[in-house]
Amino acid sequence: TGALRQGQVAAQQALEAEVYQALVLGVRDYLGKNGFPGALLGLSGGIDSALVLAIAVDALGADKVRAVMMPSPYTAEISLADARDMARRLGVRYEEIPIAPGMAAFETMLAPAFSGLPADTTEENIQARIRGSLLMALSNKTGALVLTTGNKSEIAVGYCTLYGDMAGGLAVLKDVKKTLVYRLARWRNSVSSVIPERIITRPPSAELKPGQTDQDSLPPYETLDAIVEAYVEYGRSAPEIIAQGFAEADVRRVLSLLRINEY
């Protein structure tokens, strides 16, 4: 059994290496064949943008990649520290553009129209759209392609913002589930430690409101990914997925989100 486990580990690592190298090749080919001089992305201090940054540098070289941290009042200091640390490790051009002035401007412009209405995800989405606009402005000015950083799990259930973090020219992780994102990050760090360990281990958060984590809105990613895979890739029905041992409430919620967002 020891040899079997060893073989399983080797096969797993081979899969992760193959997927990572395919993502690197995809980025390099796409930019090269379309004539883009380089790439830029929003670096949040989270694992998705960290992995995309590593892939971009491996594909293009650090001199052709620009990372932009766009902190809001809800951005944790450790997110800033981790983004700076990762940019330093990879040697990319890095800058910080706070979005608080943009948030204040939108609040002022929309105050008459929003009068009497409670705050909700609208205000969260405005933050994402400010960031998307900043990245697209930099893209227009420099010719660099914006790489979006959302993963398959988030995109499938709509845990992202149209015209916000979805804005860009290439979605590098569009077919990579969140659980695989973690495995790919671990694999890349086994080659050389470019992703700060805290980025991998801390709970994921969009940081669009105080104390927010992804699991406030979604089931644990291990559960989410398994349900998405069963439904989307294997065509299982809700009763069949529930019969596999998943909580009915989780299955119904995930399938509802999938249906709402599949347009």
What are these regions (language model features)?
Residues 2-44, 49-263:
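ATP/NTP-dependent adenylation/nucleotidyl-transfer catalytic domains that generate, transfer
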